[in-house]
Amino acid sequence: DSGCVRIDGQPVYENPAVKQRIACIPDELYARGSETIRDMMQFYRHLYPRFDEARFRQLGEVFALDEKRPLRRFSKGMQKQAAFWLAISCRPDYLILDEPVDGLDPVMRRQVWSIVMDDVSANGTSVLVSSHNLRELEDVCDHVGIMHHGKMMLERSLDALQEDIVKAQLVTDQPLPEGLTILHQSQLGRIQTLILRGNQEDIAAKLALCHPMLCDLLPLSLEEIFIYELGGVDYDVKNILH
């Protein structure tokens, strides 16, 4: 690996002042021996000058975990809750999440994201999420980057990404007009389904030329965009960089 990670122009490596502004929730929470949440709280309190004990107590009512129980005896979902509890109590400027809700039940997932979004709204916290769950990201992120083999293949606002690709379902007896950029095409009965790249208004105008009896333009989910734009073993970069 190579390169340098910077936050606000400052290198992160061996920079305690910058690291104190960052909290990370890993895929698996590391704890030594019989360490408890209370032990970890004391540890975090010394690492993070802005650690908020009042916030810690408030979140304790939400997560309702036993502070005196060894973390290694918690289930994965309970360990994940403990990680959120500790990290959010640090009042970080930057919150880094790795597969953040893996192991949590649907109710707790919603609760956790609600807490994170409240911090974003109230404190301006920037959240960086690494996840394979695109459906989850679509609900909480406003900017998306897709990496493959360590390279950033696509980085764009979610709105811009969704504006650039459209699903069309239509019924027509005439051939499709020229000038359409078709990423995928299928047919079930008389209904054709097209995945098209381009502006929705331009696509609608072109499809109108074949006088369809039915024509619906639908937004795609982030997962669908990923499949149609980056599908295939090697992810054809030429299809997404323009």
What are these regions (language model features)?
Residues 95-99:
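Catalytic Walker B motif of ABC-type/P-loop ATPase nucleotide-binding domains
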Residues 26-82:
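ABC-family P-loop ATPase nucleotide-binding domains
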Residues 195-242:
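C-terminal coupling/interaction segments
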Residues 111-200:
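ABC transporter nucleotide-binding domain
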Residues 20-26, 145:
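ABC nucleotide-binding domain signature
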Residues 106-108:
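Helix N-cap at the start of a conserved alpha-helix in ABC-type nucleotide-binding domains
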Residues 2-18:
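Conserved ABC transporter NBD signature motif
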